Amino acid sequence: MGHENIWYSHPRKYGPGSRYCRVCANHHGLIRKYGLNICRRCFRQYAADIGFKKLD
């Protein structure tokens, strides 16, 4: 059994390892609210394009 069969063989159906940013595929700092599924870094970059407005 080679390492190709073992690597990433654990099922990722739930938990933080199963979700990733739809822009950069990062697992950390994920914003899931409203079904965004974008990490916080990409959200800051694309917030205006999505339609979010920064309030004072």
Swiss-Prot record:
Co-factor(s): Zn(2+)
Cellular compartment(s): Cytoplasm, Cytosol; Cytoplasm; Rough endoplasmic reticulum
Domain of life: Eukaryota
Subunit record text: Component of the 40S small ribosomal subunit.
UniProt: Zn(2+) binding residues: C21, C24, C39, C42
Name this protein carries in UniProt: Small ribosomal subunit protein uS14
Cellular component GO terms held in the UniProt record: cytosolic small ribosomal subunit; ribosome; rough endoplasmic reticulum
GO BP annotation list: cytoplasmic translation
Cofactor binding note from Swiss-Prot or TrEMBL: Binds 1 zinc ion per subunit.
